[in-house]
């Protein structure tokens, strides 16, 4: 990234503007303020930086610009941009070329989407964008390369969606190396961003309520990290993935994904507080944005619009919102998820 102009030269834009006329709108909107946590209910969807139509996953709706008006029209007011490339040494890349026709939004386009109502967070991780959490040097390299991207592209927050490499120590009060390095990453990012910069997390259920069965390895591995940021107020909300496998309640009880019963058991467990080795990890309803597949095929445990409505209505507006994988999947099948939830928020 090019260095900023010396403050002694700030008169230059005025001279250029005077000689050449007003600067074009795109030049004026390259930067925009961090928006902070949305005050109302949220419908959060993942935006894919690859083409799911071209590769045959979810035709006919594939990649779409992040400022596409359809996204907002169908209810999505929080966008999780997925995912940056992470090189083995921790270097983060956010660039065109995931597929031939795919382009990441320019800073001006990000501002355009935000001005239209979107809060945009960058989602880190996913099933294929792992980071080596065994190395503090890799963690530091990631922080040093992702922060300039977050600033340059006007992101409002980060979403932690790491699905590989995180493992618990077996003792809830002692962080493993991988847990400590994930905290190192989160703290490193938050320390360099505005105070209203957001943090969300989207772990699979095994990493959270799975800790009710046993604490160690992947089981419950997110719990001490969730507790740290829920307790200190930096966690906007939790997007636990209520899909892709059976789900556990607070007492080791098991539920099928895609059921209202399982949705309620998970949600109530987090609100009540999961007790692990005498430590309580609690995420109240107003910090829960449960994650569901947008359409059949997007993930195991798909819930029909009717079942989604039953699950949401059970809480009479207590939940912060709902998350879905993904905006692009929803667009491929008529936006039924977004339209259904939009009418209930």
From Swiss-Prot:
GO terms, biological process: chitin catabolic process; polysaccharide catabolic process
Role played: Secreted chitinase involved in the degradation of chitin, a component of the cell walls of fungi and exoskeletal elements of some animals (including worms and arthropods). Participates in the infection process and directly acts in the penetration process of the host cuticle.
Top-level EC class: hydrolase
All residue ranges annotated as the GH18 domain in the record: 41-345
UniProt name for this protein: Endochitinase 4
Keyword Glycoprotein: yes
Pfam families membership: Glyco_hydro_18
Listed CDD domains: GH18_chitinase_D-like
The encoding gene: chi4
Protein origin, superkingdom: Eukaryota
UniProt keywords, alphabetically: Carbohydrate metabolism, Chitin degradation, Chitin-binding, Glycoprotein, Glycosidase, Hydrolase, Polysaccharide degradation, Secreted, Signal, Virulence
Catalytic reactions on record: Random endo-hydrolysis of N-acetyl-beta-D-glucosaminide (1->4)-beta-linkages in chitin and chitodextrins
GO molecular function, one term: chitin binding
Originating organism: Metarhizium robertsii (strain ARSEF 23 / ATCC MYA-3075) (Metarhizium anisopliae (strain ARSEF 23))
The protein's Enzyme Commission number: 3.2.1.14
Family the UniProt entry places it in: Belongs to the glycosyl hydrolase 18 family. Chitinase class V subfamily.
């Amino acid at each position: 990234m090019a260095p900023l102009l010396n403050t002694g030269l700030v008169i230059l834009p005025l001279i250029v503007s005077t000689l050449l006329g007003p600067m074009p709108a795109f030049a004026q909107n390259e930067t925009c303020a961090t928006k902070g946590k949305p005050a109302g209910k949220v419908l959060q969807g993942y935006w894919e930086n690859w083409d799911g139509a071209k590769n045959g996953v979810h035709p006919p709706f594939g990649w779409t610009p992040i400022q596409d008006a359809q996204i907002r029209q169908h209810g999505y007011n929080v966008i999780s941009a997925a995912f940056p490339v992470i090189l083995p040494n921790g270097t983060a890349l956010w660039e065109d070329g995931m597929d031939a026709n795919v382009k990441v939004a320019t800073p001006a386009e990000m501002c355009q989407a935000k001005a239209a109502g979107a809060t945009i967070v960058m989602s880190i991780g996913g099933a294929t964008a792992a980071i080596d959490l065994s190395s503090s040097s890799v963690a530091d390299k990631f922080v040093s390369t992702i922060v300039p991207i977050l600033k340059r592209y006007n992101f409002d927050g980060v979403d932690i969606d790491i699905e590989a490499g995180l493992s618990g120590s077996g003792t809830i009060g002692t962080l493993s190396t991988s847990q400590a390095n994930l905290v190192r990453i989160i703290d490193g990012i938050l320390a360099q961003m505005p105070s209203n910069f957001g943090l969300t997390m989207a772990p699979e259920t095994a990493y959270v309520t799975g800790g009710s069965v046993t604490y160690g390895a992947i089981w419950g591995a997110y719990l001490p990290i969730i507790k740290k940021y829920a307790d200190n107020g930096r966690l906007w909300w939790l997007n636990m993935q209520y899909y892709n496998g059976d789900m556990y309640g607070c007492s080791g009880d098991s539920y099928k994904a895609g059921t209202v019963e399982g949705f309620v058991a998970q949600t109530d467990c987090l609100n009540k507080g999961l007790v692990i080795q005498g430590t309580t990890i609690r995420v109240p309803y107003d910090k829960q944005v449960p994650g569901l597949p947008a359409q059949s095929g997007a993930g195991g445990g798909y819930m029909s619009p009717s079942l989604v409505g039953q699950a949401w209505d059970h809480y009479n507006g207590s939940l912060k919102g709902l998350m879905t994988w993904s905006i692009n999947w929803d667009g491929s099948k008529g936006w039924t998820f977004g339209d259904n939830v939009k009418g209930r928020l």
